[in-house]
Amino acid sequence: MRIITNSLIILCFIFTGSVSAVPYERGIPTEAQWDLKKPITTLMQLRQQKTLYAFVGDKLRPVAEICPNQGFYASAAEGDYHKIQFGNAQGYLEAGYLEDGYFEDIVSIKPDKKIRFLSDSTKKTDYPIYEYLITTKNTPIYSDKDTASSQIAILLSNLRYPVLSRTIKEDADGNKINWFEISLGDRLGYISSRDVKPDLGIPVLTYHHILKATENHNFRHTSTTTSLTAFTEQMNYLKDAGYETLSLNQVAGYLNKSVNLPGRAVALTFDDGLQSVYRYAYPLLQENGQRATLFVISSRIKSKTPKWAPNSLQFMSWQSLKSSRDVFDIQSHSHFLHRLDNNKKPIIFSRQSHTIILDLQRSQRVLRLLNPHQYAFAYPFGGYNQRAINAVKASGMTLAVTTQQGKVRLGDPPFALKRLYALSTDPIEKFARMVGNDEYEVVNKNIVVDK
């Protein structure tokens, strides 16, 4: 059975409907089955408007409505589908609705309007991505920097889309409009800044210890102990508001421009590998269909699950870690480096490069028994310098997170990524602004960490 069926054709200029995500079914190729490096060289056009599908995060979903009689590059049909460039990856169009185009690189469609394609030489290079935009509604893509020009497609809501450049142009009334230049099907298109929001980064939230208020006697004054009530409210807000929880591997793809992600996206991280996270966070995340990265101090994994004792910091056992892998992406928080020196400074600062590398490699060997893909590191107590960064790179990691506060933005250094702390005392309205694409960054200062 085909997923993409013939549907009522909606006029491109008045498209306002929404399209729900579709599940994986036989006949739809997975991302891994496509050769994403295969060049797209054939110019095509649609005979009628059609929905474009693409992987956004982990989901295959509708991403755009492609207007008819608009040229773009597409692959020859592979099975039931053509493949065209969409954002950082590819999209899929049902075969049978394309016809070969007979266009040159620049084709007149009106006396004063032109269709422009990325040149062959440009397609062979890493065309630079300037930034991302976020769609909050169904958004027209124009053939020129003018709302009177023809629409080539409708970009659907809740998408992050790469931007090639910005241009300011006056409209007929003399108002200055900021235009985003993008590429779809290796064709240049233009989106008005009035229709979208600039992407201000992906929030990576940090948690450590979770307790019920009634059992928290020893950690009331540590910022990194979160009440179960507040944590539940925060996770339920993310679910109800439609946020997709990302792996840090997807965050890396956002930075290296290799994946497409939704506009409402957040990454959850838990440092240390405490039993309270397994007791309270794991079942809630599992129920909500959410996932997180768990940074484990590998030398502190317990052979047996300890009897619950909320007055102390208890670490997860092998059994707890194994049984929670459906939610947690288990990564390294070091083996023996999670300590402070006599001056109360992270001990990583006083260790030589080879010592740090050996520690991280040992941690990776241990954690590969739980997760063979070891690629991310959380600096103990957030302590890092260039020597630590070089050691993380040398150990084979591809990214690392700090305790510096802020969102992850395009261009950020992958071995010094920022995160955010949400406190138990934060009203849910503040939490919403913290994770949202808010113009003013919301952070909590003076964080007191559990020792």
Residue ranges and their predicted role:
Residues 124, 129, 137, 170, ...:
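N-terminal pre-catalytic segment of deacetylase/amide-hydrolase enzymes
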Residues 200-225, 262-266, 280, 286-385, ...:
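Metal-dependent polysaccharide deacetylase catalytic core of the NodB/CE4 family, i.e.
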Residues 1-6:
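Positively charged n-region of N-terminal signal peptides that target proteins for export
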Residues 226-259, 368, 389, 393-427, ...:
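C-terminal domain-boundary segment and adjacent tail
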Residues 22-38, 64, 85-127, 174-210:
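Boundary regions of SH3-family modules and the immediately adjacent low-complexity/disordered segments
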Residues 7-16:
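Bacterial N-terminal signal peptides
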Residues 24-80, 118-177, 213:
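Beta-loop motif signature
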